[in-house]
Every structure is written in structure tokens, then in C-alpha cells.
Amino acid sequence: MNVLVVEPLKAPYEKEIDPGLESMQHEVGGWIEAMGLDEDACIICNEEGKLNGLELNRSIKDDRGRIADIIAGTFLVVGSGEENFDSLTPAQMEKYKKQFRYPETFMRFGGEIVAIPIKPHSRPAGEKHKTEPER
């Protein structure tokens, strides 16, 4: 089954896993919980991730862009068939890679929890990293 793996503080990546319960439990590190994402895809995460203090990973937002939940620990994005989980289609894979492309950190601001994307820094070509102040 071709799935998207989303680990805390890392970019998401494709992985081929066995379609059984044990392989999904192995990937998320414990008992699994399925959360609907769209009509044809869902998130498989560690059911006790928050209780066990796993690192906060990505936010799930409602249709107004507000945080509805925060997933703790590694999670999978899988296709959802009639009765079973399924591989993501290539279009779904690209959609969810884009949706979860940036790791997030979380903080309380103005009485609400906000998600802050962690985007990679880029330097112009040829610019070197400075280790000492210029003299």
C-alpha cells in the first residue's frame, strides 16, 4: 500500500507498506486511530500520541482555516476505500505532500494555539554561511 508518512519536523515522504494492521501500528508507534481527512483519504495516527507525550507534528484545520486538532507523533495519510484502507492515488499523494510539506511548531498567542510553519532557509547561490563576524 503506497502511503504518505509525515514525521514531526520532517518533510513528508512516500512509502510502500503492507496493508495490514501491524504494519500501520509499526509506522505510528502504537495503537492506531483513523481520522477522516477527505471523502477518499484519512489519517492514521497513534491513538495515544498526546497522552504518551509524543512530539506535536502537524495541525489539521477546519474549512475556515482554524486549527481543529493537532496530531502528535508520526502519522500516515492513506486512501480510504469502501471497507479498507488503500493506496493513495498519484494525485492524492501530491495534494497531501503539498498540504503537509512544512513541519510546524505551536505556540499560544492571544488565547489561541497557532501553528507556525518551519520553512527551510535558502541562500542566494554563492553566498557562504558566516561563522565569524566580519572584521
Mark where each language-model region is:
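N-terminal nucleophile
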Residues: M1-A11, K15, P19-S122
